Every structure is written in structure tokens, then in C-alpha cells.
A protein has these predicted regions:
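Active-site-adjacent structural elements in enzyme catalytic cores
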Residues: 1-209
Length: 209
């Protein structure tokens, strides 16, 4: 059965949020527009959906997915956030900045990498934040492209048999979120992206916004 597709406009946004949240709560995969690229999304509490994501992305169990937060203040519920991370979140969230942090003991396994870290973002997209809030849970996100392929910037670039619901937000920029690791008070830029971050000196100095 082909997936359901909805065009995201000001008039359809509320219905799109409700449909996306219902799809995720039902254990489905939703293809949604983020700030720069399209991504597959699943509810972290749905084991079948998580395993389906892993199979689609050929993702080993020791590699976690990005977790999306509806509110920046939810960060502490899942990660150990040092001062440096809190400064970055305060300056750039909501926005296209993904923070890699030490996981709290009760953080979902689907987020965890083998080194004990998790990746979190409070997205700049109001639509995406509304979807996460409407699910009442933590939403996993991963880019909607095959490993080694360019990111998907159009809904039609993604195979229709890979998702249950697609929300068409038009053509996107193709610029991913900036990926920054902040563990033990030190910062490392893992991937350059939409947010420019200056690496501080190793004395743990503050990061300018």
C-alpha cells in the first residue's frame, strides 16, 4: 500500500501535525522536513519502528539515532549537560544544532552509542517541534538517504516504500544540522552545518554564540 502524502502549508499544518503524531504513536515511520533535509522519524518507545529504521539505514546497534526534543529544557531528562552544552543550547536552540552528550542511565537505548553518548536536538522547525510535542514522547530522527548518498532535499527523492507518511515541505536547503560533541566540558565539532561554532581552547573556555 502506498504511503499517505500531505503537502505542508499554513492551512494544512495542524492536520499534518496530528497525522504525523498519530503515525508515530502507531509505530509507523514518518518522512518529515527538518531545517535542511528530509528525515525518517520514529517514536523511540516503538521497538518495531526502531528496528525498521536500523534496517533501512544499515545502522549497527552500537550507533544511536538523533533524538528530537519539543523543548530545550527537556535536555536534562536524557543527557548529562555540562556548562558548555547549556551555553550552546541557550544560544542556538531551537535550531539546527545537534549536541552529542553523555547519556543519563535511563536514556532510551535507541539513542545510545557504544561510547555512552547520545545525540539530541531541539529543531528550529516549529512544525517538527509540534509533532514531537503531540506524540508525548521522544522522537528519533535520521536522514532520509542511503549511506554514502546525498541528503534528500525533496520528498520525491525518497523511495515511497520506505515510509508510512510523507509530509511535503517543498525543496529544502540540503544543509544539515551542525553536530557538536560536548563531553567532560570539552567541545569537538563532528560535522559542520547550518550553525557556525568556534572550537574553544582546551581550557574549557566559553563558546561564543
Amino acid at each position: 500500500m502506498p504511503p499517505v502524502r500531505l503537502r505542508l502549508t499554513r492551512e494544512t499544518e495542524r492536520a499534518a501535525v496530528e497525522r504525523a503524531a498519530a503515525t508515530l504513536r502507531g509505530g509507523g515511520i514518518a518522512l518529515l522536513p527538518a531545517e535542511g533535509v528530509y528525515g525518517f522519524h520514529a517514536l523511540a518507545s516503538s521497538e518495531p519502528a526502531v528496528e525498521r529504521l536500523r534496517a533501512m539505514k544499515a545502522r549497527a546497534p552500537e550507533r544511536g539515532f538523533i533524538g528530537l526534543l519539543a523543548r530545550a529544557e527537556d535536555l536534562d531528562a536524557y543527557a548529562e549537560a555540562p556548562r558548555l552544552a547549556l551555553e550552546l543550547a541557550s544560544a542556538h536552540w531551537p535550531g539546527p544544532l545537534t549536541l552529542v552528550l553523555a547519556a543519563r542511565p535511563d536514556a532510551p537505548n535507541a539513542l545510545r552509542a557504544s561510547d555512552g553518548t547520545i545525540a539530541l536536538r531541539c529543531p528550529g522547525s516549529e512544525f517538527l517541534r509540534a509533532v514531537v510535542a503531540a506524540t508525548g514522547g521522544l522522537v528519533l530522527s535520521t536522514s532520509a538517504n542511503e549511506p554514502g548518498s546525498p541528503p534528500a532535499v525533496r520528498l520525491d527523492a525518497v523511495a515511497a516504500d520506505s515510509y508510512d507518511l510523507g509530509i511535503d515541505g517543498g525543496d529544502l536547503s540540503g544543509i544539515p544540522s551542525t553536530l557538536v560533541r560536548v563531553v567532560s566540558g570539552y567541545l569537538e565539532i563532528l560535522r559542520a552545518g547550518a550553525v557556525r561554532i568556534a572550537e574553544p581552547p582546551l581550557d574549557g573556555g566559553a563558546v561564543p554564540p
